[in-house]
């Protein structure tokens, strides 16, 4: 069965991709959940138009992502959190906490899903946090966790 994906499907493809899947998988899972539509000639033409518009938008988004990366590059973010005697935090610092601290420090609004914490932040100290702004642009934020 030939389908056009409307959403990202792990292991299968991204929106706009034309994929060949088993009939049951397409009919019982992908189409009812609106992850895909049937691949007709009209739908394929429409997908090509959408892809052209998306590529033009991606160029604009790349410039915007580079601008935000420049803003984040020189930003030092301080986050205060409750901690015990040995510097161990009560809980941990989450991506949402990092976004809130960046905004409070005068940085741009970020999406918490774009913030990557490679290891959980569970103690006081200095950390480097990666922010994926665009597939080609990743910014780093210097985060200082201090005791409240």
UniProtKB/Swiss-Prot annotation:
Membrane-spanning intervals of the chain: none
Alphabetical keyword list: Ribonucleoprotein, Ribosomal protein, RNA-binding, rRNA-binding
Listed Gene3D superfamilies: Ribosomal protein L9, C-terminal domain, Ribosomal protein L9, N-terminal domain
One of the GO biological process terms: translation
Entry GO MF terms: rRNA binding; structural constituent of ribosome
Cellular component terms per the entry's GO annotation: ribonucleoprotein complex; ribosome
Pfam families: Ribosomal_L9_C (PF03948), Ribosomal_L9_N (PF01281)
Listed InterPro entries: Ribosomal_bL9, Ribosomal_bL9/RNase_H1_N, Ribosomal_bL9_bac/chp, Ribosomal_bL9_C, Ribosomal_bL9_C_sf, Ribosomal_bL9_N, Ribosomal_bL9_N_sf
NCBIfam families on file: L9 (TIGR00158)
Family classification: Belongs to the bacterial ribosomal protein bL9 family.
Function statement: Binds to the 23S rRNA.
Entries under PANTHER family matching the protein: 50S RIBOSOMAL PROTEIN L9
Protein name stated in the entry: Large ribosomal subunit protein bL9
Organism: Frankia casuarinae (strain DSM 45818 / CECT 9043 / HFP020203 / CcI3)
């Amino acid at each position: 069965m030939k389908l056009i994906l409307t959403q990202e499907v792990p292991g299968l493809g991204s929106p706009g991709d034309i994929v060949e899947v088993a009939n049951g998988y397409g009919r019982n899972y992908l189409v009812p959940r609106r992850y895909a539509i049937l691949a007709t000639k009209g739908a394929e033409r429409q997908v090509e138009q959408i892809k052209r518009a998306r590529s033009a938008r991606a160029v604009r988004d790349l410039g915007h992502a580079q601008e935000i990366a420049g803003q984040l590059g020189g930003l030092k973010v301080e986050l205060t959190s409750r901690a015990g005697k040995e510097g161990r935090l009560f809980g941990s610092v989450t991506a949402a906490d990092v976004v809130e601290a960046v905004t409070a420090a005068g940085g741009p609004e970020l999406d918490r899903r774009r913030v990557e914490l490679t290891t959980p932040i569970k103690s006081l100290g200095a950390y480097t946090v990666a922010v994926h702004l665009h597939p080609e642009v990743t910014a780093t934020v210097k985060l200082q966790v201090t005791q409240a």
